[in-house]
Amino acid sequence: MDWLHVVALAVIQGLTEFLPISSSAHLILPSQLLGWPDQGLAFDVAVHVGSLAAVVLAFHREVAHILRDWVAQCRGGPATPESRLGWAVIVGTLPAVVIGFLLENVIESYLRASLVIAITTLLFGLLLWWADVRGSRRHALTAMTLRNALIIGFAQALALIPGTSRSGITITAALLLGFTRQAAARFSFLLSIPLILAAGSLKGVELIESGEGVAWGTLVAGTLMSFVAAWLCIKLFLAALDRIGMLPFVIYRLILGIVLLVWVA
């Protein structure tokens, strides 16, 4: 992989992992539409590490408080809003993990296609717009219940279909449940931590088993660029979210979906 591909793919991963526009779609499309070579397992691991480091850094205080209170409750301490949020993240993660494990081969064989990406980009983009318009936006993140987390978790499992957008569908579900934009986005980002960790770990195991060669210079560059892009994306997205809402991302998804439909027609 040349340096242009390294820079482009790392920045794409970092930006699209947390914006409601689908990282998987943007990583699949360069190979399918532009003929770029597959980035390989090692590079996949590298950009996942960069994205994971970015979201943990961006939410380091919240993550530290959640872990502290969750561990304390497990040892017999009192329940707190942070410990309950920890349980909510666990419950919200389970559906995607279980369904992904059961249907991985089906998804890889039948759903990683440009037409599927075009349809899901359009469909779930419109659903995001509807949720943003119709959601009551009354509940703060402290109002997250295990029932809400489970519903959002099943919505997150839909993001196994390329083009759906993990952040997009979880924010959509949270908005429809009445959460504020900030609460919906923050819970979506917290949910990303165990999933990115799991995905990166699985790819790491696959990399070790495959015996694939590692170009360390490329991996370090990919990790750093993915980290910087993801961290900036998270900070800017949260800062602008209440002002701009979801409409800019919906418009982008509609344009992208239409372009893809024309391309594959």
UniProtKB/Swiss-Prot annotation:
<dbReference type="GO" id="GO:0050380">
    <property type="term" value="F:undecaprenyl-diphosphatase activity"/>
</dbReference>
<feature type="transmembrane region" description="Helical">
    <location>
        <begin position="1"/>
        <end position="21"/>
    </location>
</feature>
<keyword id="KW-0997">Cell inner membrane</keyword>
<feature type="transmembrane region" description="Helical">
    <location>
        <begin position="244"/>
        <end position="264"/>
    </location>
</feature>
<feature type="transmembrane region" description="Helical">
    <location>
        <begin position="113"/>
        <end position="133"/>
    </location>
</feature>
<keyword id="KW-1003">Cell membrane</keyword>
<keyword id="KW-0573">Peptidoglycan synthesis</keyword>
<feature type="transmembrane region" description="Helical">
    <location>
        <begin position="151"/>
        <end position="173"/>
    </location>
</feature>
<dbReference type="GO" id="GO:0046677">
    <property type="term" value="P:response to antibiotic"/>
</dbReference>
<feature type="transmembrane region" description="Helical">
    <location>
        <begin position="87"/>
        <end position="107"/>
    </location>
</feature>
<feature type="transmembrane region" description="Helical">
    <location>
        <begin position="188"/>
        <end position="208"/>
    </location>
</feature>
<dbReference type="GO" id="GO:0071555">
    <property type="term" value="P:cell wall organization"/>
</dbReference>
<keyword id="KW-0046">Antibiotic resistance</keyword>
<protein>
    <recommendedName>
        <fullName>Undecaprenyl-diphosphatase</fullName>
        <ecNumber>3.6.1.27</ecNumber>
    </recommendedName>
</protein>
<feature type="transmembrane region" description="Helical">
    <location>
        <begin position="40"/>
        <end position="60"/>
    </location>
</feature>
<keyword id="KW-0961">Cell wall biogenesis/degradation</keyword>
<dbReference type="GO" id="GO:0008360">
    <property type="term" value="P:regulation of cell shape"/>
</dbReference>
<dbReference type="GO" id="GO:0005886">
    <property type="term" value="C:plasma membrane"/>
</dbReference>
<keyword id="KW-0133">Cell shape</keyword>
<dbReference type="Pfam" id="PF02673">
    <property type="entry name" value="BacA"/>
</dbReference>
<comment type="similarity">
    <text>Belongs to the UppP family.</text>
</comment>
<keyword id="KW-0378">Hydrolase</keyword>
<dbReference type="InterPro" id="IPR003824">
    <property type="entry name" value="UppP"/>
</dbReference>
<keyword id="KW-0472">Membrane</keyword>
<keyword id="KW-1133">Transmembrane helix</keyword>
<keyword id="KW-0812">Transmembrane</keyword>
<feature type="transmembrane region" description="Helical">
    <location>
        <begin position="214"/>
        <end position="234"/>
    </location>
</feature>
<comment type="function">
    <text>Catalyzes the dephosphorylation of undecaprenyl diphosphate (UPP). Confers resistance to bacitracin.</text>
</comment>
<dbReference type="GO" id="GO:0009252">
    <property type="term" value="P:peptidoglycan biosynthetic process"/>
</dbReference>
